[in-house]
């Protein structure tokens, strides 16, 4: 019995101890069970035992937080062990906003976002330590301390207050930086912390100043809208406010939507307060408007309607504005300056009149640049053929394309009745306005050269019989009051321009020029190929008889050889009757003998020509020395006969032609004039009757009797594009075997012109070796590409010639490397036999992409038929093989042309080839 009593006493004492502990805990945190049960969601708190432990108390607070309205930050209330913070962050922001509505809520939200990561990292450790004896002891020690409800007051009666003071943004940043920069020995880094604090303070000060200025712009614009009778819910007002908020977020970083809403609410409240206190005062705002448009569309009448006064003379029968004038007035306490201009004429013949007027306007606006441009046209003026395009292009040429970036299209006579549609039924007013607006906007896009332009359109009606509302304001057929809407568009453009200059959002961007219109990288591979191309040196007229590079090295061998043709026995050619009497074998022997004699005779003529050239060269060298010894002696050319013009041969006809070929139209004479002008034939051009789509000009001359020079140019033009090619070159000798060639080229690359300045010097290393070094510079698309090249030419014996070159070209930080090797093998009797084989190899590296190509070409005679074979292949597996044969005797080769004809017929009949592929 005693044992049972002792057990009951122990149980009772245990229950009393638990009850005492639970009551002390409730008193410690200041929680009224009834209030908790009343304020918490249903089913979460049932009695005082629910908060009998810290873990359960955290659960209860978290459940209550989850039921509260969610915020963007989505912060959850956390009860920590060392700092008992029981006030939810989400509600603190809402309560402060409801009481004062100032920037404290925004600052607190930013603090919460800064503390969010730290709180979430500590949640797991706090949950584990809550149930420990240490946590219970700390809560017991703090049982006598109670927190006040603070600013939240009656809004949260069921939740305890956090006794600890919130961390500021700077303190949170310092705390975070201190933890991140912890050293291995446990000592924090104070240098980085101080730097972070200094940068944060400077950025915050600058950002606050910018926000304050932008807030003043918001207030100013809301006051303007209020003066014009427009609410913040107006489409234009809402769009401008949205753009201001977007610009602020782009300039100063991302901000929450709630902060933007608070800024708008404060600006709206401040604007209403200022307007209520000072309704009659003039605003610190002025707008300058430039008026442009055709004559008779109602520019001056609209100005009078804006000021509600006869500021400008109007006439319905003749132009009333004869000069540029400035009209200044006040509309609803807003200073408005309008630059009225004389009317423009749409005809192409009157463009000089328009240029004179716009020249006067340009001089006038130099004093005060306009904020907005109003381009006037009539709504009832039907035009679908871009008849106003010349006028708009004239405006664009004189003022620049930027004149349309801040332009508003004003359509007068807006009360006109809509015309009939295609079905005979009158169009709706909205469709009528949309069609007319689209035509004017499209014409402006064409004139400005920017198809992205979308100029706003405002409707205007100045007729005295226009319908009005109770306040006497003119109303359009669609129910719109046009005057405040037009002024609101003008003021909105000025406000956005002020915000743009404040936030400096367009330092690198230019309207109408997407992405700053970056200069494109020049085509380096194409320019490098042009640089590596070998060019022949220019020669004086008396040097044209000089031997070629190949024959110059064979002088001794040619002199030592005897003429085999002189040693042949006499030969009598047979007549046609005598040939018919010969047998087939005799006729073949006769033909072989005749071919050998013809070959030896050509060889003899070639050697005689070489000897004659060498003698001429020696005489010219001797004459040059005599001229240097007697510089005053002049040549007497008066006794020479005048050159007689002779007709030049006609252009070669294409392989396929008809009677419409206009070769006879462009016959010309070769005269003594050094200028040679010829037409350029395009066999595959668009014009069948006149295939000459360009002309070519050439001239050779000598500068100071020492420097040979040449000028050549070609211009071609078809329906789609035009091409210009110009080349000027000159050679300068400076020593034996040293020649410098300079040139200037202009050529069309795409839609741009490329200007190239080049120079190369060739000098003889040895008797059979010549080296060339050159530089070049090309200007294209505001970019300069410069490069160098090195070339070496060597002769091996009489039949082999090798040319090796390499170069590099750089431009706009980009580089291209390339080189080529060419080996030529000539026949034994070249150039008489015309047997020649060439092997080429080219390499180019651009952007790490290695391109390797090889080509082989060979030509030889088979009887009297010339055979030419070509083959090329690159490292990407693509290549080409071609064989060509030309003969004047084997006419049966024409039958080969039947093969492609038959192939085309088979493809058309059975559907083979033709680029079709089966799926």
UniProtKB/Swiss-Prot annotation:
Residues binding Mg(2+), per UniProt: 300
Pfam families referenced in this protein's UniProt entry, alphabetically: AIG1, TOC159_MAD
Domain of life, per lineage: Eukaryota
Biological processes, Gene Ontology terms: protein targeting to chloroplast; protein transport
Disulfide bridges in this chain: none
Free-text cofactor note: Binds 1 Mg(2+) ion by subunit.
Residue ranges constituting the AIG1-type G domain according to the UniProt record: 284-513
Annotated stretches, region: G5: 461-463
Regions of compositional bias (Low complexity) in chain numbering: 641-650
Cofactor(s) essential for the protein: Mg(2+)
Residue sites binding GTP per the record: 296-301, 413, 461-462
Stretches the record annotates as Disordered: 20-47, 64-211, 540-585, 611-650
Sequence ranges of Polar residues compositional bias: 182-207
Membrane topology according to the record: Single-pass membrane protein
GO cellular-component term (any): chloroplast outer membrane
Locations listed in the record: Plastid, Chloroplast outer membrane
Stretches for region G2: 319-323
Family statement drawn from the similarity comment of this UniProt entry: Belongs to the TRAFAC class TrmE-Era-EngA-EngB-Septin-like GTPase superfamily. AIG1/Toc34/Toc159-like paraseptin GTPase family. TOC159 subfamily.
Entries under NCBIfam families matching the protein: 3a0901s04IAP86
Function: GTPase involved in protein precursor import into chloroplasts. Seems to recognize chloroplast-destined precursor proteins and regulate their presentation to the translocation channel through GTP hydrolysis. Probably specialized in the import of nuclear encoded non-photosynthetic preproteins from the cytoplasm to the chloroplast.
Subunit relationships: Part of the TOC core complex.
The name this protein goes by in its record: Translocase of chloroplast 101, chloroplastic
Source species: Physcomitrium patens (Spreading-leaved earth moss)
């Amino acid at each position: 019995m005693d044992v049972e009593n002792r057990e009951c006493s122990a149980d009772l004492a245990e229950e009393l101890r638990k009850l005492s502990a639970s009551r002390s805990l409730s008193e410690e945190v200041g929680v009224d069970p009834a209030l908790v049960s009343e304020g918490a969601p249903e089913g979460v708190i049932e009695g005082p035992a629910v908060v009998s432990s810290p873990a359960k108390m955290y659960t209860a607070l978290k459940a209550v937080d989850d039921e509260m309205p969610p915020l963007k930050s989505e912060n959850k209330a956390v009860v920590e062990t060392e700092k008992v913070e029981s006030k939810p962050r989400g509600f603190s922001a809402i309560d402060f906003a409801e009481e004062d509505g100032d920037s404290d809520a925004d600052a607190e939200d930013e603090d919460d976002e800064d503390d969010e990561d730290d709180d979430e990292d500590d949640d797991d450790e706090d949950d584990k330590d809550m149930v420990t004896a240490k946590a219970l002891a700390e809560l017991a020690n703090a049982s006598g301390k109670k927190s006040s409800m603070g600013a939240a007051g009656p809004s949260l009666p069921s939740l305890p207050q956090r006794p600890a003071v919130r961390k500021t943004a700077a303190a949170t940043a310092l705390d975070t930086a201190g933890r991140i920069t912890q050293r291995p020995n446990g000592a924090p880094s104070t240098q980085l912390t101080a730097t972070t604090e200094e940068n944060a303070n400077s950025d915050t000060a600058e950002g606050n100043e910018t926000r304050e200025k932008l807030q003043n712009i918001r207030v100013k614009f809301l006051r303007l809208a209020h003066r014009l009778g427009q609410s913040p819910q107006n489409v234009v007002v809402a769009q401008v406010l949205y753009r201001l908020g977007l610009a602020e977020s782009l300039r100063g970083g991302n901000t929450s939507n709630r902060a933007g809403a608070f800024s708008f609410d404060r600006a709206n409240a401040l604007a209403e307060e200022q307007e209520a206190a000072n309704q009659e005062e003039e605003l610190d705002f002025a707008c300058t408007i430039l008026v442009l448009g055709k004559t008779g569309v109602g520019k001056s009448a609209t100005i009078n309607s804006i000021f509600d006064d006869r500021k400008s003379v109007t006439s319905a029968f003749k132009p009333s504005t004869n000069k540029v004038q400035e009209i200044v007035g006040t509309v609803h306490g807003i200073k408005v300056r309008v630059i009225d201009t004389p009317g423009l004429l749409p005809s192409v013949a009157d463009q000089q009149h328009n240029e004179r007027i716009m020249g006067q306007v340009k001089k006038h606006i130099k004093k005060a640049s306009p904020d907005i441009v109003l381009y006037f046209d009539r709504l009832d003026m039907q035009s679908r053929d871009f008849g106003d395009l010349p006028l708009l292009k004239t405006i664009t040429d004189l003022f620049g394309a930027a004149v349309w970036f801040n332009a508003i299209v004003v359509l007068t006579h807006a009360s006109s009745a809509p015309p009939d549609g295609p079905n005979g039924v009158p169009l709706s007013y909205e469709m009528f306005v949309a069609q007319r607006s689209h035509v004017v906007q499209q014409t402006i896009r064409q004139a400005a050269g920017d198809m992205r332009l979308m100029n706003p359109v405002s409707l205007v009606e100045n007729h005295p019989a226009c319908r009005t509302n109770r306040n006497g304001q003119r109303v359009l057929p669609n129910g719109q009051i046009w005057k405040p809407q037009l002024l609101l568009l003008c003021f909105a453009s000025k406000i956005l321009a002020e915000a743009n200059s404040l936030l400096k959002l367009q330092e690198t961007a230019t309207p109408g020029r997407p992405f700053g219109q970056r200069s494109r990288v020049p085509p380096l591979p194409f320019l490098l190929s042009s640089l590596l191309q070998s060019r022949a040196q220019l020669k004086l007229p008396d040097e044209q008889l000089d031997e070629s590079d190949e024959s110059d090295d064979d002088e001794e061998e040619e002199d030592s050889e005897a003429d085999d043709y002189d040693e042949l026995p006499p030969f009598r050619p047979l007549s046609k009757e005598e040939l018919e009497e010969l047998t087939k074998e005799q006729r073949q022997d006769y033909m072989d003998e005749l071919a050998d004699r013809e070959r030896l005779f050509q060889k003899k003529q070639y050697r005689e020509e070489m000897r004659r050239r060498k003698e001429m060269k020696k005489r010219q060298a001797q004459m040059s020395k005599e001229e240097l010894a007697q510089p005053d002696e002049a040549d007497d050319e008066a006794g020479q006969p005048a050159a007689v013009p002779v007709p030049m041969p006609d252009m070669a006809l294409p392989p396929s032609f008809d009677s419409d070929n206009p070769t006879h139209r462009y016959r010309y004479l070769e005269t003594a004039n050094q200028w040679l002008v010829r037409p350029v034939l395009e066999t595959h051009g668009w014009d069948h009757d006149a295939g000459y789509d360009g002309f070519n000009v050439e001239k050779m001359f000598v500068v100071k009797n020492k420097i040979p020079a040449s000028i050549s140019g070609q211009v071609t033009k078809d329906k789609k594009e035009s091409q210009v090619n110009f080349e000027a070159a000159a050679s300068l000798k400076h020593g034996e075997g040293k020649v410098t060639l300079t040139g200037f080229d202009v050529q069309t690359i795409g839609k741009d012109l490329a200007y190239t300045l080049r120079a190369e010097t060739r000098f003889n290393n040895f008797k059979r070796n010549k080296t060339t070094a050159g530089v070049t510079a090309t200007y294209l698309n505001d970019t300069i590409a410069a490069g160098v090249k090195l070339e070496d030419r060597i002769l091996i014996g009489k039949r082999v010639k090798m040319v090796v070159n390499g170069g590099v070209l750089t431009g706009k930080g980009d580089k291209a490397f390339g080189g080529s090797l060419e080996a030529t093998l000539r026949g034994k009797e070249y150039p008489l036999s015309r047997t020649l084989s060439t092997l080429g190899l080219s390499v180019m590296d651009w952007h790490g992409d290695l391109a390797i190509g090889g080509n082989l070409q060979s030509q030889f005679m088979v009887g009297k038929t010339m055979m030419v074979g070509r083959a090329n292949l690159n490292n990407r597996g693509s290549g080409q093989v071609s064989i060509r044969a030309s003969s004047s005797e084997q006419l049966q080769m024409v039958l080969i042309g039947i093969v492609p004809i038959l192939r085309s017929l088979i493809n058309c009949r059975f559907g083979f080839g033709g680029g079709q592929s089966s799926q």
